[in-house]
Amino acid sequence: MLNNAMSVVILAAGKGTRMYSDLPKVLHTLAGKTMVQHVIDAANELGAAHVHLVYGHGGDLLKQALKNDNLNWVLQAEQLGTGHAMQQAAPFFADDEDILMLYGDVPLISVETLQRLRDAKPQGGIGLLTVKLDDPTGYGRITRENGKVTGIVEHKDATDEQRQIQEINTGILIANGADMKRWLAKLTNNNAQGEYYITDIIALAYQEGREIVAVHPQRLSEVEGVNNRLQLSRLERVYQSEQAEKLLLAGVMLRDPARFDLRGTLTHGRDVEIDTNVIIEGNVTLGHRVKIGAGCVIKNSVIGDDCEISPYTVVEDANLAAACTIGPFARLRPGAELLEGAHVGNFVEMKKARLGKGSKAGHLTYLGDAEIGDNVNIGAGTITCNYDGANKFKTIIGDDVFVGSDTQLVAPVTVGKGATIAAGTTVTRNIGENALAISRVPQAQKEGWRRPVKKK
């Protein structure tokens, strides 16, 4: 179906008192992303020409958090209802576009459901998203005559008979811009709350003989709003369960789907195995046959085929080629790069460092601002001293170098191909190819030496 141009209004002016937080409610996160960002992303994916964000409380915090989004900011200085919020945005509506109304605290609304709503909107009428609940207490009821939607009655204004209706309003609707502006201008606050209800436009449209078409979401969770942290935590689990199900059906082995969190996008190959309590953040790519141990955190990284990441390892903004082994308890910080077959063991930290093919840093090591060649062995306790308190410097280690335990490389320094560095050495000057570097103080031995005795 050919759709009209469309703009989206997102209502985000509420304070969120029941969150007991200094943050505006819509800035609380679900799956690592603010609730309102989920909604903005859905609007953009739908192809919205403009996204109007109606804000009130915490405007400065909202603008800072959403500074990279192309939004039209609309102030609602007083919170006088949903209709009043839409009235603030109405001057920005084009007559010939459709206006879709969304909510910043309803984060799981799907693009698929919104597209069905958009497709179902009749010419000159309203598309309305509704659901049926066993217990509709507190929600606006959908009234019908001969099956046709005639209006929405808020719970506080409903009669006993109307309160028996199970079909309720989700608040999400779409209508033509010119029609929306005309109906908004007719709203009154003659109700129990003394507010301007956007829902009253349904009755206004019906009185004009306009058609109102109701569409149901694929899942109830899509239209669940968040008013407190308990509701937010429940939606988090719903979201994570859905993501885990998709991954399992796509061939990823999650050892316990209930103990896996996806806070971004995961691209994966075949026969990937992920153990319990793993967190995936940002954009992560896992190659074929990758294994990730329990308790790992992987963020914005590319992991090549046949890599194995042992438990409790943190990988952030890193790139691993095929057949690398990491951990346990390793940390790869931004800029870490491992070439094919490289190994980083327990309690090894890398930042802005490249470890060559087949090279190994087995344990208790810091490699920062370093370029390490192929088939290099880094002994335990090795440190690249890259920072002088003001500036950072680079360490370059050639192929086939052996670095003994407890070595300090004071950058800037270059170690030539095939060199050997004896254990306990502090390297302050460049080392030539195939040379042995040693800087230990000669060992002294005192025969018959006795330890001091504590005084009683």
Curated annotation (Swiss-Prot):
- What's the cofactor? Mg(2+)
Q: Give the EC number.
A: 2.7.7.23, 2.3.1.157
- Active site, per annotation: 363
**Could you give the cofactor binding note from the entry?**
Binds 1 Mg(2+) ion per subunit.
Provide the residue span(s) of the region labelled N-acetyltransferase. 251-456
State where it is primarily located.
cytoplasm
Region feature (Pyrophosphorylase): 1-229
**What Pfam families does the database record attribute to this sequence?**
Hexapep, NTP_transf_3
- In which residues is Mg(2+) bound? 105, 227
What subcellular locations does the record give? Cytoplasm
Top-level lineage group: Bacteria
| GO MF annotation list | glucosamine-1-phosphate N-acetyltransferase activity; magnesium ion binding; UDP-N-acetylglucosamine diphosphorylase activity
Enumerate the InterPro entries for this protein. Bifunctional_GlmU, GlmU-like, GlmU_C_LbH, Hexapep, Hexapep_transf_CS, MobA-like_NTP_Trfase, Nucleotide-diphossugar_trans, Trimer_LpxA-like_sf
Please provide one cellular component term from the Gene Ontology annotations of this protein. Answer: membrane
In terms of PROSITE patterns, this protein maps to: HEXAPEP_TRANSFERASES (PS00101)
Provide the binding site for acetyl-CoA.
380, 386-387, 405, 423, 440
Residue ranges, annotated region (Linker): 230-250
Question: What pathway or pathways are given for this protein in its record?
Answer: Nucleotide-sugar biosynthesis; UDP-N-acetyl-alpha-D-glucosamine biosynthesis; N-acetyl-alpha-D-glucosamine 1-phosphate from alpha-D-glucosamine 6-phosphate (route II): step 2/2; Nucleotide-sugar biosynthesis; UDP-N-acetyl-alpha-D-glucosamine biosynthesis; UDP-N-acetyl-alpha-D-glucosamine from N-acetyl-alpha-D-glucosamine 1-phosphate: step 1/1; Bacterial outer membrane biogenesis; LPS lipid A biosynthesis
Supply one GO BP term. Answer: UDP-N-acetylglucosamine biosynthetic process
Q: Which UniProt keywords apply?
A: Acyltransferase, Cell shape, Cell wall biogenesis/degradation, Cytoplasm, Magnesium, Metal-binding, Multifunctional enzyme, Nucleotidyltransferase, Peptidoglycan synthesis, Repeat, Transferase
- Quick one: which residues bind UDP-N-acetyl-alpha-D-glucosamine? 11-14, 25, 76, 81-82, 103-105, 140, 154, 169, 227, 333, 351, 366, 377
Q: Does the record carry Ribonucleoprotein as a key word?
A: no
The entry assigns this protein to a family as follows: In the N-terminal section; belongs to the N-acetylglucosamine-1-phosphate uridyltransferase family. In the C-terminal section; belongs to the transferase hexapeptide repeat family.
> Its function?
Catalyzes the last two sequential reactions in the de novo biosynthetic pathway for UDP-N-acetylglucosamine (UDP-GlcNAc). The C-terminal domain catalyzes the transfer of acetyl group from acetyl coenzyme A to glucosamine-1-phosphate (GlcN-1-P) to produce N-acetylglucosamine-1-phosphate (GlcNAc-1-P), which is converted into UDP-GlcNAc by the transfer of uridine 5-monophosphate (from uridine 5-triphosphate), a reaction catalyzed by the N-terminal domain.
* Subunit details: Homotrimer.
Annotated protein name in UniProt:
Bifunctional protein GlmU
Per the UniProt record, the source organism is Escherichia coli O127:H6 (strain E2348/69 / EPEC)
